[in-house]
Amino acid sequence: PQLMRNIADVNRQHETGRWLATNLGIETVSPPMVKKHLGVKTRPFATEEWGSVVREGAKILNENHWFPAATIIIGWPDETPEDSQATIDMMNDFRTMNFRGLVAPLLYQDFSEKNSMHFGNLNEAQFTLFWRCWENNLRVINDIIPIILRNKTYGPPMKIFMYGILKAGTWAIMRYLRGLCKDLFNGRTPDEIIEKYSRSRSVSSQKMITKKL
């Protein structure tokens, strides 16, 4: 935590209110999935602490004016609805703590096509997680604009173009997901699907912000 504060001080982020972007590879916070697929990534913390580490780490990044671009992997071959629920809980906690950052949900891809995840194979829990990620992105999209405007690599026309792409792209994805939901779940709407997973909580899920780094 202190290192992040020191870096923010060097960059004068607290003084100027300037936000910088960084990557955050979350992938999953389900303890069984973390233990099996993430391996040494969680060290020096235990695999079952990963969810709390991610929550606390995201909080520290935001407190020091860092805007994370995080990744989530959906559709591991051995993933259960309980595993998805653990990461859904994290997304719900992100919303509660007003997390500022993008979360990109990625479908699992394997060397074998039959083991890869496709949109048509999403179950209700996986769809809910995908939806929650893009709901988060729609919520924070305006936070990205100052980062783009400060980027000296792009001229004004390109900045305007990128802003339009971000807004239109996020809107188009949400619209696509609404249609996909009806196709996958017999005409049901996203609200009907996600309600079940918003009210419940994974039995293995950590409470929000329990691991002090």
Model-inferred region functions:
Residues 16-17, 56-68, 94-99, 134-161:
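A structural motif corresponding to the C-terminal end of an alpha-helix
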Residues 125-213:
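Radical SAM enzyme core and accessory elements
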Residues 1-68, 74-76:
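Conserved SAM/AdoMet-binding glycine-rich loop
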Residues 95-106, 115, 201-203, 207-213:
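Long amphipathic alpha-helical scaffold regions
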Residues 50-51, 89-100, 108-110:
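C-terminal, active-site-flanking charged/polar segments
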Residues 3-7, 77-93:
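Catalytic cores of alpha/beta
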Residues 27-39, 74-82, 98-132, 145-162:
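Flexible glycine/acidic-rich beta-alpha junction loops that bind and position SAM and/or redox cofactors
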